[in-house]
UniProtKB/Swiss-Prot annotation:
Has multiple subunits with at least A(3), B(3), C, D, E, F, H, I and proteolipid K(x). This is A-type ATP synthase subunit A. PANTHER family: H(+)-TRANSPORTING TWO-SECTOR ATPASE, V-TYPE PROTON ATPASE CATALYTIC SUBUNIT A. The keyword Cell wall biogenesis/degradation does not apply. It is a peripheral membrane protein. ATP binds at G238, P239, F240, G241, S242, G243, K244, T245. Belongs to the ATPase alpha/beta chains family. It holds the Pfam family ATP-synt_VA_C. Keywords: ATP synthesis, ATP-binding, Cell membrane, Hydrogen ion transport, Ion transport, Membrane, Nucleotide-binding, Translocase, Transport. It comes from Haloferax volcanii (strain ATCC 29605 / DSM 3757 / JCM 8879 / NBRC 14742 / NCIMB 2012 / VKM B-1768 / DS2) (Halobacterium volcanii). It is found in: Cell membrane.
Amino acid sequence: MSQATQDSVREDGVIASVSGPVVTARGLDARMNDVVYVGDEGLMGEVIEIEGDLTTIQVYEETSGVGPGEPVESTGEPLTVDLGPGMMDAIYDGVQRPLDVLESKMDSAFLDRGVDAPGIDLDEKWEFEPTVSEGDEVAPGDVVGTVPETVTIEHKVMVPPDFGGGEVVAVEEGEFSVTEAVVELDSGEEITMHQEWPVRQARPAAEKKTPREPLVSGQRILDGLFPIAKGGTAAIPGPFGSGKTVTQHQLAKWADADIVVYVGCGERGNEMTEVIEDFPELDDPKTGNPLMARTCLIANTSNMPVAARESCIYTGITIAEYYRDMGYDVALMADSTSRWAEAMREISSRLEEMPGEEGYPAYLAARLSEFYERAGYFTTVNGEEGSVSVIGAVSPPGGDFSEPVTQNTLRIVKTFWALDADLAERRHFPAINWNESYSLYQEQLDPWFVENVEDDWAEERQWAVDVLDEENELQEIVQLVGKDALPEDQQLTLEIARYLREAYLQQNAFHPTDTYCSPEKTYGILTAIHAFNDEAFKALEAGVPVEEIQAIEAAPRLNRIGVQEDWEAYIEDLKAEITEQLRELY
């Protein structure tokens, strides 16, 4: 990290008191949000409050053993991230320290305090291919060259947004480190492949647009019923064991984003281990290249210091915005925003601020809004179009959706995927409750599905929603009087709804074929169930008893469409078989 260099250290202060991750210093020459180094070991921290001669600092490392009288040094710069080639296929902690580099420095699997490293390798050579010539005019955000960062990602070197721009007077080509100048402007400014950006400040864009294209996730219930747009926001709240992390992993694996930034914020370390183990073995369905080649991991697990959780979300979204400026579609997974909010609550209570609901700070809603509003579909300052989609998991204690983090998140996000403990106990996965979930992007995304999948996509989806709604209403009656007391048409509706639940809404994340379902296959499964519905009701009207309709041999084959590789032929055969068997009954 740029602030790790410690060369620009200014006036010293002295520690006055220590309370967990919050340190108070006296006589420190610093501004709000400046990065400081605390104590004899130089622990990294950030200024969060200044009152007279006292400066309050949140420290991103364990503070045990740090005491009053030890020095505090200010860098005079805010918390920034290093941006440049080398971030893909990397794994960072919450303040962008590369964990593999730290491990090699310490010869240990455990982090020592005070150890630091830049976010990207400043000495590694990259092949720079210029896209500008001498005499060209460039402005902030313009692309001046490209670097093959991974087999999947072409890294675009841009004029930093805080540069003035001007005429190109010198251009280099060949292998350079990220700190060497590759383009020189007439103003004397030198452009390198390395940029720095403060994490709490959104990167500028020319225009924020209405999203029109879905972020295809490969999960039937999401793409079919509750889609999220590229540049959209979604929340996945749910109790423990309901499948938040597996859903996030599925989205990180199969979403059709160009780049995925996965932020593990305060969750268990073995969940990040699973990502590191699984992703290198999987191929991107869009390009066929390894998934890690488009993925950046930020691991701030539950056994790491609380204060660093607060910064890891900002680190992730800043990296996402940087790739968005290159014209890429980026998906950011935050697992879990509840742990981030709990970190804010702890810092707030240490500062003795007035608590809000359930002890969370009064500014919880503002911080959540600040984060989610950095998502969007943008025209960048260089005229490219790029997006940042944010999908945040929420972990309400006991699955109580009325708690502050869930409620404040719901006011902001436009897609809500409610995970249900009852569905998880019944082994219905993904355990997304179709009666509570919603997407406000449906109408603006329907034209894309109509153009790219089928003309009657919206009608088929609405039919499925209506059947599931009717089943929900009938369930109350069934629990009172039993299924056999219902009229035959309602019994048949319950049977159709069962196939919708089992064949369409359920999906096996661990099956090699069923783990990813294209929009075309999602539509195909729905039309197969709809065809069974139409033929079954024709048979019922012709006087065939509902028991005989339910007993046909072809119907259970609907549940096996998801695992078929040659699903198109399978669906055609199945439709013909269902029609034939039902028509034999009347």
